[in-house]
Swiss-Prot record:
Species the sequence originates in: Streptococcus pyogenes serotype M4 (strain MGAS10750)
Main enzyme class: ligase
Chain sites annotated for binding Zn(2+): C395, C398, C413, C418
Stated role: DNA ligase that catalyzes the formation of phosphodiester linkages between 5'-phosphoryl and 3'-hydroxyl groups in double-stranded DNA using NAD as a coenzyme and as the energy source for the reaction. It is essential for DNA replication and repair of damaged DNA.
Protein's UniProt name: DNA ligase
Gene3D superfamilies: 5' to 3' exonuclease, C-terminal subdomain (1.10.150.20), 6.20.10.30, BRCT domain (3.40.50.10190), DNA ligase/mRNA capping enzyme (3.30.470.30), Helix hairpin bin (1.10.287.610), Nucleic acid-binding proteins (2.40.50.140)
Length: 652
């Protein structure tokens, strides 16, 4: 189970990167959801194997170059997904267990891009993207070009609101027609078009593309008591609010609303991919709280995927940076969710074997939420027995023999000198989440590798202007920019370097957790496995992988070469203080705080070494209870958990 959890974590994180960061989804929503739900089930059964970089512990995407970073005062969370009436009933049961009289507000789930708008004294100050939920991109100038976003509110309020920016189907059609006439690549769907538009550096382009918005939340403290009152206030302030919402008291009413909306979905002027159900009482919302990733007071019902038939013409096999060989099917073109689809993932050889997929087969292709599709299964009634599937025995890149380990689902090339493996490793090292070497993408990495200028990541820091000038298509100005980006990467905080090394199981968040404790890459050369395993959020698998990597002589040589080249080895963030007053404690906040707001209290607790969670359990060490604390306080008492008040926290 441990290995399957790791496989799912790695796969889903790659899909998340493609979806949130590149705005180029590589798997359908429905397929992603199926894998995600499998991971959730396994993690619930084996909580000791949950990895720090698991997508169940994360929110959103990563930060793109070109706009300033913006730290959200109020974090943006994702929503728990539901795909059936039974899952909605289970959500209702959990809520009603604490609040028997709870009512719900059902709203449309707009398929766009999450935005946050901050106003001071009624004037728009900042418009930002979600980013990773804590840090987004400041896109204020582009936000100001969206006609239905007020620059000044009808009242002089200081307020932060949330919503969705989207592109109407009519605008999307017009833009793609124009792009086709100009010989430009068409957008895959309205969501991608909206995302690309908001990241435009030319604000005139943003204005021309006619984005629109629906606002649905006050993130800052509000005087309203109910979610439907929040929507009414947002409309009064001049924001666009979606007119399709319904106050309900039962799941029967919600299910009727879902079916009504699903029936008229195609008649709407914009794309939706589901219905969001929220506890209407804001006081109940606060008491229910959050998981690491999502609020406990809301759930998103997602519509079933659209399905079409297509024929598999051929299969491409590509090698990733860890040696995993991934199959992609080339299909007869088919119209699916408004776009032409000609490629779909086949995941791995085990998936192909399980579904008995062959070249020449007619298959069911599905795509939820306008995302690039995957193959669901084979239409066996259309098979004529002439179909074949040739599973490669040799690496498509280097020609060495592929292996299929018993505990893995994929074929793997284990040749350390495989050109594709080396190139993917170099690309990973230069990528945004790693060393963020702007401009050093796959095309240039390939040219550098084929020219013999780079063989490992340390070689990047030995490149000269002359090296770049020898490459086809690289002019002096481009060479100067690349060298400047390489030089700038030397000053990155060490967790980016650790992630960039591409060690198995060591994601970006895990890298930060490790460096928060060790502070320096060099210290990892002698770190003990049992010490690493004790770091909160890690475990034996990560610890073993890290120590095995740094026990290699080649790792010590590589670190020395990078250090000699001037690459920073130190962690620039705040190191964990094991002497902090609440170090290692799991703490829950409940009730109304009078002096501190929730974020201030959470920040203080984390600064004192605590891990703040949203629910009380046997693993909880401490509960900070404000006034009007409800069921969480009672549960803490029943479990004999230590309870303190706000004054106690303020005095620490």
């Amino acid at each position: 189970m441990k290995k399957r959890i790791k496989e799912l974590t790695d796969l889903l994180n790659r899909y998340r990167y493609d979806y949130y960061t590149k705005d180029a989804p590589s798997v359908s929503d429905s397929d992603y959801d199926k894998l995600y739900r499998e991971l959730v089930t396994l993690e619930q059964s084996y909580p000791e194997y949950v990895l720090q970089d698991s997508p169940t512990q994360q929110v959103g995407g990563t930060i793109l170059k070109g706009f300033e970073k913006y730290r959200h005062q109020y974090p943006l969370f994702s929503l728990q997904d539901a795909f059936s009436r039974e899952e909605l009933d289970a959500f209702d049961k959990r809520v009603k267990a604490e609040f028997p009289n709870a009512t719900y507000l059902a709203e449309l789930k707009i398929d766009g891009l999450s935005i946050s708008l901050s106003y001071e004294n009624g004037f728009l100050q900042v418009g930002a993207t979600r980013g990773d939920g804590n840090i987004g991109e400041n896109i204020t100038e582009n936000i100001k070009k969206i006609k239905d976003i007020p620059h000044q509110l009808s009242e002089p309020l200081t307020i932060t609101v949330r919503g969705e920016a989207y592109m109407s189907r009519q605008s999307f059609k017009a833009i793609n027609e124009a792009r086709q006439e100009n010989g430009e690549t068409e957008f895959a769907n309205p969501r991608n078009a909206a995302a690309g538009t908001l990241r435009q550096l030319d604000t005139a382009v943003v204005a021309k593309r006619q984005l629109a918005t629906f606002l649905y939340q006050e993130a800052s403290p509000t005087a309203r008591n109910q979610q439907n009152e929040v929507l009414a206030e947002l409309a009064d302030l001049g924001f666009s609010v979606n007119p399709y919402y319904q106050l309900t008291s039962s799941m029967d009413e919600i299910w009727d609303f879902i079916k009504t909306i699903e029936a008229k979905r195609d008649q709407l002027a914009y794309d939706i991919d589901g219905v969001v159900i929220k506890v209407n009482s804001l006081a109940m919302q606060e008491e229910l709280g959050f998981t690491v990733k999502a609020p406990r007071w809301a759930i998103a019902y997602k519509f079933p995927a659209e399905e079409k038939e297509a024929e598999i013409l051929s299969v491409d096999w590509t090698v990733g940076r860890t040696g995993v060989v991934t199959p992609t099917a080339n299909l007869t073109p088919v119209q699916l969710a408004g776009t032409t689809v000609s490629r779909a993932t086949l995941h791995n050889v085990d998936y192909i074997a399980e579904k008995d997929i062959r070249i020449g087969d007619t298959v069911i292709v599905y795509k939820a939420g306008d995302i690039i599709p995957a193959v669901l299964n084979v239409v066996m009634s259309k098979r004529n027995q002439q179909e074949v599937m040739l599973i490669p025995k040799l690496c498509p890149s280097c020609g060495s023999e592929l292996v299929h380990f018993e505990d893995e689902v994929a074929l793997r090339c284990i040749n350390p000198l495989c050109p594709s493996l080396i190139q993917r490793s170099l690309e990973h090292f230069a990528s945004r989440d790693a060393m963020n070497i702007t401009g050093l993408g796959p095309a240039i990495v390939e040219k550098l590798f084929l020219a013999g200028f780079v063989h490992d990541v340390a070689d990047i820091y030995q490149l000269t202007k002359e090296n770049f000038m020898q490459l086809d298509g690289i002019k002096e100005k481009s060479a100067d920019k690349l060298l400047a980006a390489i030089e700038a990467s030397k000053s990155n905080s060490a967790e980016k370097l650790l992630f960039g090394l591409g060690i198995r199981h060591i994601g970006s968040k895990v890298s930060r957790l490790i460096l928060e404790v060790y502070g320096d890459i060099s210290a990892l050369l002698t770190a003990k496995e049992e010490e690493i395993a004790r770091i909160d959020g890690l475990g034996s698998t990560i610890a073993q992988s890290l120590t095995q990597y740094f026990e290699q002589k080649t790792a010590a040589i590589l670190v020395d070469e990078l250090k000699t080249a001037g690459v920073n080895m130190h962690y620039s963030g705040q190191k964990v203080n094991s002497d902090a007053a609440l170090f290692g404690l799991t703490v829950v906040l409940t009730g109304k705080l009078n002096q501190l707001n929730r974020n201030e209290a959470k920040d203080k607790l984390e600064a004192l070494g605590a891990k703040v969670t949203g629910s009380v359990s046997k693993k909880t060490d401490l509960v900070i209870a404000g006034s009007d604390a409800g069921s969480k306080l009672e549960k803490a008492k029943s479990l004999g958990i230590r309870i303190e008040d706000e004054d106690w926290l303020r005095q620490l």
